[in-house]
From Swiss-Prot:
Name of the featured protein: Neurogenin-1
Pfam families cross-referenced by the UniProt entry: HLH
Localization of this protein: Nucleus
Annotated keywords: Activator, Developmental protein, Differentiation, DNA-binding, Neurogenesis, Nucleus, Transcription, Transcription regulation
Biological process per Gene Ontology, one example term: genitalia morphogenesis
PROSITE patterns: BHLH
Sample GO molecular function, one term: DNA-binding transcription factor activity, RNA polymerase II-specific
Gene designation per UniProt: Neurog1
Length: 244
């Protein structure tokens, strides 16, 4: 009988030792969990803190970036305002210079036309020729004088060809040999003061070269009706045929 009792006691001891080891292992697991919980809590707190640190630093950097952007925008706006003001001043100065040039040009043109009117045959005092009328009349006047001199030299033989071509009252108007006493007097002024220089205006005489091109008038009289000019000379001379 003693042998079975010993075996039972040994079995009980083994079982108790096994249960103690199980309890010890269970206790150790609980202790491990209890130990791990504070560690996890501390690590969880540290991780958000670490994550929140960049957000705080980024939040601190955002106002600085906004300030820089605002400063850049302000600078751009100032540059635009300055450039617009500069462009406005440049345009104004260019406009003023252009107006001055145009004013000077018109003054010079009017002075030249006045000088041209002074050498043309005289009109009544109340007559005022426009610019285009002055130019046409000067063209016709020069053309008539040139044709008269050319026909006098080529068409009629003899030394007194010009005197026979022009009327007697216009003979003193012809230019003579230059003399030192008459250097200050021009032939144009003498022609303007003489009665032979009363030439019709291109507007009043539609058969003039320039008026025939610009106006649709019918055929009129001769261009310059000199009293001593032969009537058939204007019709037989080739240079006068286009102006009939």
């Amino acid at each position: 009988m003693p042998a079975p009792l010993e075996t039972c006691l040994s079995d009980l001891d083994c079982a108790s030792s096994n249960s103690g080891s199980d309890l010890s292992s269970f206790l150790t697991d609980e202790e491990d969990c209890a130990r791990l919980q504070p560690l996890a809590s501390t690590s969880g707190l540290s991780v958000p803190a670490r994550r929140s640190a960049p957000t705080l630093s980024g939040a601190s950097n955002v106002p600085g970036g906004q300030d820089e952007e605002q400063e850049r925008r302000r600078r751009r706006g100032r540059a635009r305002v300055r450039s617009e003001a500069l462009l406005h001043s440049l345009r104004r100065s260019r406009r003023v210079k252009a107006n001055d040039r145009e004013r000077n040009r018109m003054h010079n043109l009017n002075a030249a036309l006045d000088a041209l009117r002074s050498v043309l045959p005289s009109f009544p005092d109340d007559t005022k020729l426009t610019k285009i009328e002055t130019l046409r009349f000067a063209y016709n006047y020069i053309w008539a004088l040139a044709e008269t001199l050319r026909l006098a030299d080529q068409g009629l033989p003899g030394g007194g060809a010009r005197e026979r071509l022009l009327p007697p009252q216009c003979v003193p108007c012809l230019p003579g040999p230059p003399s030192p006493a008459s250097d200050t007097e021009s032939w144009g002024s003498g022609a303007a003061a003489s009665p032979c220089a009363t030439v019709a205006s291109p507007l009043s005489d539609p058969s003039s070269p320039s008026a025939s091109e610009d106006f649709t008038y019918g055929p009129g009289g001769p261009l310059f009706s000199f009293p001593g000019l032969p009537k058939d000379l204007l019709h037989t001379t080739p240079c006068f045929i286009p102006y009939h």
